[in-house]
A protein has these predicted regions:
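Short, conserved active-site loop motifs that form the nucleotide-linked donor/cofactor pocket
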Residues: 30, 109, 142
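Short, well-ordered coil/turn elements that cap or connect secondary structure elements
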Residues: 27, 60, 104, 136-139
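Active-site rim elements
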Residues: 25, 117-119, 148-150
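C-terminal catalytic histidine-bearing segment of alpha/beta-hydrolase fold enzymes
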Residues: 112, 124, 128-131, 135-175
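A generic structural signal for short coil/turn motifs at secondary-structure boundaries
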Residues: 1, 53, 118-121, 153-154
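The feature captures the conserved acid-bearing segment of alpha/beta-hydrolase catalytic domains
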Residues: 56-78, 89-128, 132
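Primarily recognizes the serine-hydrolase "nucleophile elbow" in alpha/beta-hydrolase
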Residues: 11-80, 93-94
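Cap/lid segment of the alpha/beta-hydrolase catalytic domain
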Residues: 1-7
Length: 175
């Protein structure tokens, strides 16, 4: 199911970006995002360039990735589906991990999580590692926020100001 969900996310993004004039959208202003498993799907869609390239789309053209409480290692559901020997929260960084696709050429990236110990186990730390890795590689626009007192769902409930500010910042940076 996780690989099928990823294929669906990529196909939906490609559909949105194909013939943008017919859909009334500016392809330069498309952000891809999600929460929890949706953040993993969005990250993989935008970070592993091969997925959108299969549709003739350069993922670097996305306006940004908006990732809320996402798993930046290989998603635990995919590990179950593919019979990985690792436990649910044991980190795996392979071709199915956003952390395995770090590059300074990625679109702008926002990472928002709940507080460590309240959000998913290891989630805030995985997101911090991704932000640090991208910054070390010279990525021009990555932001990472951990919302104090927020659990996994609470991060979503309280992420709107971070999303709004980041979209404005990323849009301004593209000009």
């Amino acid at each position: 199911p996780a690989r099928a969900a990823l294929a669906d996310a990529v196909a939906a993004t490609a559909w949105t970006l194909k013939r943008p004039e017919a859909r009334g959208i500016d392809p330069e202003r498309v952000f891809v995002g999600g929460m929890s498993a949706g953040a993993w799907l969005a990250a993989m869609t935008g970070m592993d360039r091969s997925y959108l390239a299969a549709y003739g789309i350069d993922s670097r053209k996305l306006a940004g990735l908006l990732l809320v409480s996402g798993q930046m290692t290989t998603h635990f559901q995919l590990k179950i589906d593919l019979h990985y020997p690792q436990s649910q929260f044991e980190p795996v960084i392979d071709r199915y991990a956003p952390l395995g696709h770090l590059s300074p050429e990625l679109p702008p990236i926002l990472l928002v999580t709940g507080e460590s110990g309240l959000d998913m186990p290891g989630g805030p730390e995985e997101n911090a590692l991704m932000a640090a890795g991208l910054a070390a590689l010279g990525h021009p626009l990555v932001r990472c926020f951990h919302i104090a007192g927020a659990d996994h769902g609470g991060a979503f409930d309280r992420c709107e100001p971070f999303l709004t500010d980041f979209i404005a910042e990323a849009s301004e940076a593209r000009r």
